[in-house]
Amino acid sequence: MRLKNEIEYVFGILLYLTINGENRIISSNEISEKEEIPHLFSLRILKKLEKADLVIIFKGAKGGYKLKKDSSEITLKDAIESIEGDICIKDCLESPESCTLRKGNCGVHRVLKDIESQFISRLQDVNFRDLADGKY
């Protein structure tokens, strides 16, 4: 399993907004420049973050972006799911009938489900305030 570069950009944008956007609205140009993300790509990502209720878009000449909620409430899981949707290691974990081994009734299925649960739990434990504060 490999996270897309887009996810890395999401992490960068959310960290930048956490560190620099607490008391001000930040322009997409500033975010793109500081995080070294192509501007049009950052706009697409910011739109996805808005759709996921993680950022607010302020329109107009002095418009920009701000976190919608406190950064301590935004987790790595939220960030990944804003781009990827629900996290699922293997389709058969969500739909056992799609299991190619034993229709979801196998040791591999049970182990992967446990690994997926631990992975998601860990992603939920890490928030952007703690990341910005250097707790990891």
Where is each model-derived feature located?
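Conserved acidic, metal-coordinating active-site core of Asp-based
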Residues: F58
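Basic amphipathic alpha-helical segments that dock to polyanions
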Residues: S42, L46-E50
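Minor-groove-contacting beta-hairpin "wing" of winged helix-turn-helix DNA-binding domains
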Residues: A61-K68
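N-terminal helix-turn-helix DNA-binding core of bacterial DNA-binding proteins
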Residues: N5, Y9-I37
